[in-house]
């Protein structure tokens, strides 16, 4: 009898909140558990104005954040390997889509708007 091992990925979702009056950045969900090989999408909503750029970072435990994408107001989609970021500047929303997740994707993901 064969044993099948299913690997679960735990994508820690860092809730980032920047609150100074009207400027806020919120991410959801706060954490996500998915099966290896599956796709997932992380969301970022912001009220930052004026808007210069939006960045997605990946931070492995015990390490500093690594930039995945930098998007400006005029960019709608940007890809970096299995990571695809979308930006809708009108609704002030961004998403990070991870395709064919791997164990190495287990990390914190941070959305930064400036």
From Swiss-Prot:
In terms of SMART domains, this protein maps to: IGv
The UniProt record lists the Ig-like domain at: 23-114
Signal peptide residues on this chain, from the entry's feature table: 1-21
Q: Which InterPro entries does the entry link to?
A: Ig-like_dom, Ig-like_dom_sf, Ig-like_fold, Ig_V-set, TCR_alpha_variable
- UniProt-annotated location(s): Cell membrane
Which processes are annotated in GO (biological process)? adaptive immune response; response to bacterium
Residues linked to a glycan: 39, 45
Q: Name one GO cellular component term.
A: T cell receptor complex
Entry annotated with the keyword Cell cycle: no
Tell me the Gene3D superfamilies matching this sequence. Immunoglobulins
Q: Which UniProt keywords apply?
A: Adaptive immunity, Cell membrane, Disulfide bond, Glycoprotein, Immunity, Immunoglobulin domain, Membrane, Receptor, Signal, T cell receptor
Q: Does the keyword Transport apply?
A: no
The record's disulfide annotation reads: 44-111
Q: How does it assemble?
A: Alpha-beta TR is a heterodimer composed of an alpha and beta chain; disulfide-linked. The alpha-beta TR is associated with the transmembrane signaling CD3 coreceptor proteins to form the TR-CD3 (TcR or TCR). The assembly of alpha-beta TR heterodimers with CD3 occurs in the endoplasmic reticulum where a single alpha-beta TR heterodimer associates with one CD3D-CD3E heterodimer, one CD3G-CD3E heterodimer and one CD247 homodimer forming a stable octameric structure. CD3D-CD3E and CD3G-CD3E heterodimers preferentially associate with TR alpha and TR beta chains, respectively.
Q: Describe its function.
A: V region of the variable domain of T cell receptor (TR) alpha chain that participates in the antigen recognition. Alpha-beta T cell receptors are antigen specific receptors which are essential to the immune response and are present on the cell surface of T lymphocytes. Recognize peptide-major histocompatibility (MH) (pMH) complexes that are displayed by antigen presenting cells (APC), a prerequisite for efficient T cell adaptive immunity against pathogens.
This chain belongs to the protein called T cell receptor alpha variable 10
Source species taxonomy: Eukaryota, Metazoa, Chordata, Craniata, Vertebrata
